[in-house]
């Protein structure tokens, strides 16, 4: 049996692109092979603003948070997994799918399993960025080696993080690289595959997205119709208040999918490829891709469906102008995205997991 231990997050709760939904799909499609244990949302800590709040934080809050993260939260994971422990056999495999997050730690769970069930295989997925680990290892240089020790393999969703782990001293054979999945039953085109005039460009996501640079690109491309899906990020003041610019706050998944369906191009001005679900869902919805050439983006895209840019305003402007009026090129790129998205289906995640043992 393969046991999937996953964290539910408010930001992806109930949608068709998060880790929990991936687990739902695996359990539904392969019920005799997978079981899932879902950790509820972690406790959130409000920003400290007033003087009184700062005093309270120093007196009580800081210690309370430390105790929650180091004691309470790991204990909650152990309680969650009690039914699994009662049935665990040496041939079973455990997948920890939110690994290396100190504020939602699965490390203590990994150590407990390794100590009490030494023959059970443990695979731990991390979908963070090299920049994140740079910041964390500046505080704790042994962090990656420490967290890697109790698990059999570290899993990643892109070659850039795999390379980072290898350079950090993790043996190559202890790392396995896969892809972010896409739910192709949910993310599929409803509108005819055609190019719009003016060109419709959509931008989505908040993680590792450079809104300042995007705003400058928008200003230099006034003859493009822009759909800026900023989520809960308050960046409205950066963009021109003109009819060709639609600024959209948090959207229900169905509405976001519709906006992708009516667009031509997915523009991704990124500092890294964290949040790869934006890339994979864009491809499944048949969008031509303009992307920052960072992280693991070339694991997902190539020159047939994407234009790669350095993080430079003029490169993005040039890419957009290359597609404007070139309907044949846009159509070819859209078709290529659709075709490439087929290798990101849930069946391929299952094949990846099967090959690990």
Name each region found by the language model:
Residues 13, 327-357:
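A charged, aromatic-enriched C-terminal amphipathic alpha-helix characteristic of glycosyltransferases
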Residues 230, 235-257:
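Nucleotide-activated donor-binding/catalytic signature segment of Leloir-type glycosyltransferases, i.e.
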Residues 303-314, 322-327:
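Conserved acidic donor-binding segment of nucleotide-sugar-dependent glycosyltransferases
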Residues 193-209, 215-219, 227:
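Conserved donor-binding/catalytic core segment of Leloir-type glycosyltransferases
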Residues 134, 166, 179-198:
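Acidic anion/phosphate-binding donor-loop and adjacent secondary structure
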């Amino acid at each position: 049996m393969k046991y999937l231990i996953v964290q539910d997050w408010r930001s992806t709760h109930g949608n068709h692109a998060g880790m929990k939904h991936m687990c739902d799909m695996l359990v539904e499609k392969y019920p005799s092979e997978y079981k899932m244990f879902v950790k509820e949302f972690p406790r959130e800590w409000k920003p400290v603003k007033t003087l009184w709040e700062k005093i309270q934080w120093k007196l009580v809050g800081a210690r309370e948070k430390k105790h929650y993260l180091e004691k309470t939260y790991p204990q909650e994971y152990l309680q969650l997994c009690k039914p699994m422990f009662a049935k665990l056999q040496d041939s079973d495999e455990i997948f920890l799918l939110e690994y290396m997050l100190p504020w939602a730690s699965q490390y203590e769970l990994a150590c407990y399993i390794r100590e009490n069930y030494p023959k059970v295989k443990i695979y731990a997925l991390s979908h963070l960025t090299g920049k994140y680990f740079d910041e964390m290892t500046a505080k704790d240089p042994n962090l990656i080696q420490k967290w890697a020790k109790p698990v059999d393999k570290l899993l990643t969703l892109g070659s850039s993080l795999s390379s980072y782990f290898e350079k950090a001293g993790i043996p190559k054979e202890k790392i396995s690289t896969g892809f972010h999945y896409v739910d192709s039953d949910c993310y599929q085109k409803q509108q005819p595959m055609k190019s719009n005039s003016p060109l419709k460009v959509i931008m989505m996501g908040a993680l590792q997205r450079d809104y300042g640079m995007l705003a400058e690109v928008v200003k230099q491309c006034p003859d493009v119709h822009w759909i800026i899906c900023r989520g809960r990020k308050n960046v409205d003041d950066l963009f021109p208040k003109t009819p060709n610019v639609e600024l959209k706050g948090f959207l229900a998944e169905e509405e976001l999918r519709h906006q992708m369906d009516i667009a031509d191009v997915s523009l991704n001005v990124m500092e890294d490829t964290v949040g790869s679900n934006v890339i994979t869902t864009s491809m499944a919805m048949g969008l031509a891709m303009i992307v920052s050439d960072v992280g693991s983006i070339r694991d997902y895209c190539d020159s047939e469906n994407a234009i790669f840019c350095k993080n430079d305003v003029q490169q993005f402007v040039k890419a957009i102008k290359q597609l404007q009026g070139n309907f044949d090129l846009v159509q070819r790129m859209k078709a290529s995205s659709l075709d490439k998205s087929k290798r990101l289906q849930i069946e391929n995640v299952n094949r990846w997991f099967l090959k690990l043992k």
